[in-house]
Amino acid sequence: MAAMRLTLFRIVCLLPGCLALPLSQEAGEVTALQWEQAQNYLRKFYLHDSKTKKATSAVDKLREMQKFFGLPETGKLSPRVMEIMQKPRCGVPDVAEFSLMPNSPKWHSRTVTYRIVSYTTDLPRFLVDQIVKRALRMWSMQIPLNFKRVSWGTADIIIGFARGDHGDNFPFDGPGNTLGHAFAPGPGLGGDAHFDKDEYWTDGEDSGVNFLFVATHELGHSLGLGHSSVPSSVMYPTYQGDHSEDFSLTKDDIAGIQKLYGKRNKL
């Protein structure tokens, strides 16, 4: 169980002392409910320093969040801060720039297997299969890794849709908010990518959540990437609503993944 918790990059601190000092708000523009939502957001996505074992000020964590998103580092809640906090996003905590996951975990085999074990009812199964294949190809075009799908048994990356508590200690929260999460490369749950079944998943339509975009993001985590602070990056933590069919990895995404695996030789 301990290993399971440490595998996911989204290790959430739930201890009451994690956010030791209360947040303040600018000009009374934030409601009590939003104040509570902000505290919960910082507990989830901006973790305390486990090495020093010191209680972390909520103000410091808010400044860290403001720095990540390119906002003035006031340490105070504002409507702009709340707007970002309320956007749909990935369930993995934020780091900085194109960053890698702690200890830079990666796959050491040149062939990585994957298996899709459950589906959304919003899209035909064959289309989900095609989208996952396309998302993985975006990454494999940049690095010397190949992906092989298996239909049964074990696989390096297990992909599926689930709702609520789905057995990994990180339950989904219904429509909106957390869209999915993924585990760093490794044994057991390592590499697995989960998507919230309660979202309305689409294939690039004007409404709903673009599955290709979110799948590409989560599978980036499955390969070892953390979040990027570059808004145009696929690895940016909040959902950008990019519905275009021809979106691609940015220079930031490519730099991150090639730092882990090197470049694919072009013939």
Swiss-Prot record:
Its main location: secreted. GO terms for cellular component: cell surface; extracellular matrix; extracellular space. Belongs to the peptidase M10A family. Zn(2+) 2 binds at residues 90, 217, 221, 227. Gene3D superfamilies: Collagenase (Catalytic Domain). It is found in: Secreted, Extracellular space, Extracellular matrix. The gene is Mmp7. This is Matrilysin. A motif (Cysteine switch) lies at residues 88-95. Its EC number is 3.4.24.23.
